[in-house]
Amino acid sequence: MSLRKVRSLPSLRVLAEVSNPLVRVPPPSFTYQTRQVHNTKKNEHSPMLSSDSHASFTRMSLKTLKNECRTRGLKVSGKKTELVERILLFEGSSSKKLHTSAIQRAKNDSSHIDSMKIPNVAKLEAEAESRKTDYIVKVPSIVNNAATEPKTKIEKDYEKKLQPADKKPLAENVGTVATPDADNVIQTPSVSDSIKVVNPEEELRSGSSEQGRSYSQQDEELTSRDKKFLLGFAGTVAAWWSLRFWKKEESKK
């Protein structure tokens, strides 16, 4: 390509845009790169120790400085420079105390404990006892009134069964049992009225006589049965023989 053709390229591009306005040649793309640097402003770590604190206190009047000393508990008398020095010294010492919890009276103490408070043991024990009494449930004693009247249906039925035999209610059949402690008495229902004391010899004799009676009754029952059986058997045999004999006589005739 010659130099003349190269020079004529811009003019040809313009003529093409004029002849065909709908067709536009896109502009050349340029890439931009930007770099931004962040700059953080420097701040003082403790504003009470800044260089402007001295200037701020020196600008104050004598009356305001006295008020500042009075609020900090410092001495009020003196010149302006003395008041400023007192305030600055106080601010410096207070800034150091922000990061420590040591007490002044424990300076020479090598222990790691700053202070210790002994609790009131008597007060704590009284509080514990009061808490215990709050949770105690007082149940009324029902030992003396337990056997007066039957409450449940089973007890009522049991009392009805015992009344015809004892002719006394269940509440009256109550005995006492002695304990090592004389103040305590255990009440128990007494069943001595329903117990019968039996002589063993008489019991054996009555048992043997009852057994003999039962055996004799069984013998009598067996003999009557045997008699009935024998009579029935004899009757059947006689009837059978009589029928046989009757048949033979008829055959002879």
UniProtKB/Swiss-Prot annotation:
Record bears the keyword Mitochondrion: yes
Disulfide bonds: none
Keyword Transferase assigned: no
Record's bilayer topology term: Single-pass membrane protein
Transit peptide: 1-44
PROSITE patterns in UniProt: SAP
Signal peptide: none
Residues covered by the SAP domain: 57-91
Entry's Gene Ontology cellular component terms: mitochondrial membrane
Residues annotated as transmembrane: 229-246
Region Disordered, residue ranges: 183-221
Matches recorded under SUPFAM superfamilies: SAP domain
UniProt subcellular location: Mitochondrion membrane
Name of a matching Pfam family: SAP
Sections of the chain in a coiled coil: none
Sorted UniProt keywords: Membrane, Mitochondrion, Transit peptide, Transmembrane, Transmembrane helix
Compositional bias of kind Polar residues: 206-217
Family: Belongs to the AIM34 family.
Protein name listed in UniProt: Altered inheritance of mitochondria protein 34, mitochondrial
Originating gene: AIM34
